[in-house]
From Swiss-Prot:
Homodimer. SUPFAM superfamilies: UROD/MetE-like. It is found in: Cytoplasm. NCBIfam families: hemE (TIGR01464). This is Uroporphyrinogen decarboxylase. Transmembrane segments: none annotated. The record marks D77 as: Transition state stabilizer.
């Protein structure tokens, strides 16, 4: 494998000195870019794009051609794992992801098998190895998965949900059934992420998009417990260097201390968290990623630059901060505004790394 030319992102996650704060954007390969829309049209639909390793590689690299980003993230979807378990993933216009066969009974959960990442998810591994080769050491490649709780919400609800009624009913009325599902998902995610590392991923991220829907105690029981199991089972060293792991619970600002206890290297912060407060609470244990409100990219460029300045000042001096948005970039953002955001992070952060 080619030697890394820019390892700023990996170094910041491991709290090693950097010359400036690294930056990337969640969903940086996405619908705000005209070139992404063209490639997606060529693929036919979203899942066909995910399953074609050459096109998945192309869209992963597109934002890196435009911007001086410090990391690439695999173009895929968190629902590849449940899809590989045989649930029949499809996308309904205006409705988002749906499953033909939800796992809303104990019998359905018992029948689930753990997918082989090199077989049922082989298309993802082919994308990882292709992207890693094409990056040629320019920046590190991030692999990722959804958290067991977040994947389970889609599997039990049969798709997206605003209320999480079915899965919460299972959590409180049939907890043994939900624990069985979460355990299978944790085992599946461990295999899936370790296979991504074996195929070239240099950092890992676990997206717990819906952990914030849980109560204080339920979060620990149904979400954090299974992310802990995953962290314990991950390959943390490959290609002669550490493979950092980042946990991100959207709406998880209450639980940063508990998340930092898992042994992960970094925590993702959404935009509701004060980064200065987060650093005071857990900065001695973990690096922090975040956390500008993605909607700020709709603001005039001087306002974006001002927000970047405030977040950098909030984190303060020294390493251990990866700048990002607090969630994925919105599809209607002007690509020039995204570019101004990235430039502002690099230009303004040098003063904090003397």
């Amino acid at each position: 494998m080619a030697e890394l030319k820019n390892d700023r992102y990996l170094r910041a996650l491991l709290k090693q000195p950097v010359d400036m704060t690294p930056v990337w954007m969640m969903r940086q390969a996405g619908r705000y870019l005209p070139e992404y829309k063209a490639t997606r049209a060529q693929a036919g639909d979203f899942m066909s794009l995910c399953k074609n390793h050459e096109l998945a590689c192309e869209v992963t690299l597109q934002p890196l051609r435009r911007y001086e980003l410090d990391a690439a993230i695999l173009f895929s979807d968190i629902l590849t794992v449940p899809d590989a378990m045989g649930l029949g993933l499809y996308f309904e216009a205006g409705e988002g992801p749906r499953f033909e066969r939800p796992t809303d009974t104990i019998d359905a959960i018992k029948k689930l098998s753990i997918p082989d990442p090199e077989d049922e998810l082989g298309y993802v591994m082919k994308a990882v190895s292709t992207i890693r080769r094409e990056l040629n050491g320019a920046v590190p490649l991030i692999g990722f998965s959804g958290s067991p709780w977040t994947l389970a919400t889609y599997m039990v609800e049969g798709g997206s949900s605003k209320t999480f009624e079915k899965i919460k009913k299972m959590a409180y009325a049939e907890p043994a059934a939900l624990h069985m599902l979460l355990d299978k998902l944790a085992d599946s995610v461990i295999l899936y992420l370790n296979a991504q590392v074996a195929n070239g991923a240099q950092s890992l991220m676990i997206f717990d998009s819906w952990g914030g829907a849980l109560s204080h105690t339920a979060y620990r029981e149904f979400s954090l417990r299974y992310m802990q199991k995953i962290v314990d089972g991950l390959t943390r060293f490959a290609d002669g260097r550490q493979v950092p792991v980042t946990l991100f619970t959207k709406g998880g600002g209450l639980w940063l201390e508990a998340m930092a206890e898992t042994g992960c290297d970094a925590l993702g912060l959404d935009w509701t968290v004060d980064i200065a407060d987060a650093r005071r609470r857990v900065g001695h244990k973990v690096a922090l990623q975040g956390n500008m409100d993605p909607s700020m990219l709709y603001a005039p460029i001087p306002r974006i630059e001002e927000e970047v300045s405030q977040i950098l000042a909030g984190y303060g001096e020294g390493t251990g901060h990866v700048f990002n948005l607090g969630h994925g970039i919105h599809q209607h953002v002007d690509p020039e505004h995204a570019g101004a955001f990235i430039k502002a992070v690099h230009a303004q952060s040098k003063q904090y790394h003397k």
